From Swiss-Prot:
Induction: Induced by treatment with iron in roots and shoots. Down-regulated under iron deficiency in roots and shoots. Down-regulated by treatment with zinc in roots and shoots.
Biological process terms in GO annotation: intracellular iron ion homeostasis; intracellular manganese ion homeostasis
Alphabetically ordered keywords of this record: Ion transport, Iron, Iron transport, Membrane, Metal-binding, Transmembrane, Transmembrane helix, Transport, Vacuole
Cytoplasmic side: 1-32, 80-164, 212-218
Catalytic activity: Fe(2+)(in) = Fe(2+)(out)
Vacuolar side: 54-58, 186-190, 240-246
A UniProt-annotated Pfam family: VIT1
Region described as Cytoplasmic metal binding domain (MBD): 86-161
Gene name of the record: VIT2
Record protein name field: Vacuolar iron transporter 2
Source taxon at top rank: Eukaryota
A cellular component annotation (GO) from this entry: vacuolar membrane
Function summary: Vacuolar iron transporter involved in the transfer of iron ions from the cytosol to the vacuole for intracellular iron storage. Vacuolar iron storage is required for seed embryo and seedling development. May be involved in the regulation of iron translocation between flag leaves and seeds. Can transport zinc ions from the cytosol to the vacuole.
Binding annotation for Fe cation 3: 101, 109, 112
Amino acid sequence: MVKEFVQDEEKQRLLLDEHTEKHFTAGEVVRDIIIGVSDGLTVPFALAAGLSGANAPSALVLTAGLAEVAAGAISMGLGGYLAAKSDADHYHRELQREQEEIDTVPDTEAAEIADILSQYGLGPEEYGPVVNSLRSNPKAWLEFMMKFELGLEKPEPRRALMSAGTIALAYVVGGLVPLLPYMFVPTADRAMATSVVVTLAALLFFGYVKGRFTGNRPFISAFQTAVIGALASAAAFGMAKAVQSI
C-alpha cells in the first residue's frame, strides 16, 4: 500500500537533510576531462610512434610532440568553448521564444503543462492545481516549460570558459604521458618502447577510471581505451615504415 505524502514543510526539510544523494552530478566536467585526456593520450602517442617509425631522433620526436600538444590543447579548448557557447546561445533563444509563447498564447502553454503532467499518470483533478499555481508564477512557469517541455537546463554563466580550460588542461596532461620517455631516454628505439609501455598503462588506468565514473564496466572500458590507443599508434608506425620504404 502506497503511503500518502504529508504536506508538512518542516518534516519535508528534515527528510531532505537526512538523505544524502549518491548521484554523480558533475557530468559536464567529467565529459570534458574524458575528451581532453583521451585525445591527449592518443594523438601525441600516435605521432611519436609515427616519427619513431621513420627513425627520427628522440629530440625531434619530443619537439614535434610538444608542438602538437600545444596546438592540440588550443584547438580542443577552442572547440569546447564554441560548443558550450553554442549550447548557451540555443538555450537563450529558446527561453525568449518560450516567454513569447507564454505571453501571447497562455492557454495553449497551460494546456501543454497539463499534457506533460498527464504523462506521469496525473488526472485533471490532480494536475489542475499545479497548472493554476504555475500560471500565477510566471518565472516558475517559464522554468518548468524549459525543463520539462524542451528538456533544456539553464547553462552556468562561465560554462564555456570552464569547458575550454578543462579540455585544454586535460589534453596537456594526457599528451605529456607518451612524450615523457623521450625526455629521459636518449635513443629513439628505447624511448619508443618505454613510451608504449607507459602510455598503454596510462590508457588502461584512464579507461578503468572512466568506466567507474560513467557507469560502464571498468575493465571493459579499460580494454577498449587501450585498444583504440594501440591501434592508432600502430597505424601511424606502420604508415611511417611504409612511406620510408618507398
